[in-house]
Design a protein with these regions (language model features):
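Active-site neighborhoods and metal-handling regions in enzymes and metal-associated proteins
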Residues: 1-175
């Protein structure tokens, strides 16, 4: 990833831009939701059929980009995923797409949270408590402006309106 980042923005004015790996960059086995960071002497063998979340993050000039996906461990790359796991993947994808489409100028963060809840429930799933979508700023990964996957009565959250210059890292988790 560092090698590929070195190929980006190579002009005179931009070649000195800071760039590198960013959090989260990890592989989290199924029993851990995200950000697995084992000690150097720990190891874990992934098992056939286990759900695994892969997260990659990088930054250029202090702005983070990250991508994540969940896969099913399989020795056969052509193996089909079906049943509840396939439904969960479909629910996660469709719910994320709806959340992104709701994240528009004039809407509120709680509108996005409500859309996540409604969409996941249509598939018979529930958004996880805890993971948030954070507003990003220069050299700041998790700002105080958040979009919750699920409203939690005791959780402090600050409603705000979406405006044109906001940048969010959208994270979505369902069970």
């Amino acid at each position: 990833m560092v090698e590929e980042l070195g190929k980006v923005f190579k002009g005179k004015k931009t070649k000195k831009l800071e760039r590198g790996v960013a959090c989260p960059t990890c592989v989290s086995p199924g029993n851990l939701l995200m950000n697995f960071s084992p000690l150097s002497d720990e190891s874990k063998t992934l098992k056939e059929g286990e759900l695994v979340r892969i997260d990659l993050g990088c930054h250029i000039n202090g702005y983070v980009a990250h991508a994540g996906t969940t896969i099913v461990v399989s020795a056969d790359p052509a193996a089909k995923i079906d049943g509840e796991v396939a439904d969960l993947f479909k629910a996660g994808w469709d719910t994320l797409q709806l959340a992104i489409r709701t994240l528009v100028f004039g809407k509120k963060n709680l509108d996005v949270t409500a859309m996540i809840k409604r969409s996941a429930e249509q598939f018979g799933f529930e958004p996880y408590e805890g993971p948030f979508s954070h507003k990003h700023k220069h050299h700041v990964l998790d700002e105080t402006a958040i979009i919750m996957n699920k409203t939690i009565p005791d959780q402090r959250h600050h409603p705000f309106q979406i405006h044109k210059s906001l940048l969010f890292g959208q994270g979505l988790f369902c069970s």
